[in-house]
Amino acid sequence: MHAAVVVFPGSNCDRDLAVAFEAAGAQVTKVWHKDTDLPEGVDIIGIPGGFSFGDYLRCGAIAANSPICRSVAAHAERGGYVIGICNGFQVLTETGLLPGALLRNAGLKYICKTVALKVETSASAFTEGYTAGDTISIPIAHHDGNYFADDETIARLQGEDRVAFTYEDTPNGAKADIAGILSSNRRVLGMMPHPERAADAGHGGTDGQALFRALTGALAAV
């Protein structure tokens, strides 16, 4: 499996994401935001956490209009896989690849801690390494992670089994406790928690490993 990790000015989790992909058996190529084309043969694109372009204007808004994001959108529209984590989730909502928006945390404070997530569905390449209903421990680190969408969108996400993860005790005010969602074809995942920070026992947790291993296995079998 070949993964491309996009790097913006202000990204700070691109190395962590690359290491998690590599540990799961993927080949990784870093892609700069000014690039216009993806590497040949890319199976999945990872958009990492951080503070792209300093979070100016709106989190993820400037990054979403960078040259590489046109190729990311085209990849997704062709049925390619994309994962956006934290700031990457914000970028995916700004590009329109995922619905909703990430607002300022309800408590108006930056939150950095490990939280309990409930796996809502195992019916995707990202989550098939878990069982629906599992509780996993994954770190969060964000100031604008409060997921919001109108009631109709929330109902559609829930009705189509597109809510991937929810918080067991919502830290940021996210509507319907949503921590991560899937696209309509289930090949784009956006999530605020950081599974790449829970993919090595030396870092204090391994609950994120199953996501990367399942994804690598699913794409290798295609």
UniProtKB/Swiss-Prot annotation:
Which reaction(s) does its UniProt entry say it catalyses?
Answer: N(2)-formyl-N(1)-(5-phospho-beta-D-ribosyl)glycinamide + L-glutamine + ATP + H2O = 2-formamido-N(1)-(5-O-phospho-beta-D-ribosyl)acetamidine + L-glutamate + ADP + phosphate + H(+); L-glutamine + H2O = L-glutamate + NH4(+)
Domain Glutamine amidotransferase type-1 intervals? 3-222
Q: Which SMART domains match?
A: GATase_5 (SM01211)
Q: In what pathway does it function?
A: Purine metabolism; IMP biosynthesis via de novo pathway; 5-amino-1-(5-phospho-D-ribosyl)imidazole from N(2)-formyl-N(1)-(5-phospho-D-ribosyl)glycinamide: step 1/2
Xref: CDD domains? GATase1_FGAR_AT
Picking any one GO molecular function of the record gives: ATP binding
Among the entry's GO cellular component annotations, what is one?
Answer: cytoplasm
Which InterPro entries would you find in this protein's record? Class_I_gatase-like, PRibForGlyAmidine_synth_PurQ
Q: What does this protein do?
A: Part of the phosphoribosylformylglycinamidine synthase complex involved in the purines biosynthetic pathway. Catalyzes the ATP-dependent conversion of formylglycinamide ribonucleotide (FGAR) and glutamine to yield formylglycinamidine ribonucleotide (FGAM) and glutamate. The FGAM synthase complex is composed of three subunits. PurQ produces an ammonia molecule by converting glutamine to glutamate. PurL transfers the ammonia molecule to FGAR to form FGAM in an ATP-dependent manner.
Protein's recorded name: Phosphoribosylformylglycinamidine synthase subunit PurQ
Question: Per the UniProt entry, what species is this protein from, by scientific name?
Answer: Roseobacter denitrificans (strain ATCC 33942 / OCh 114)
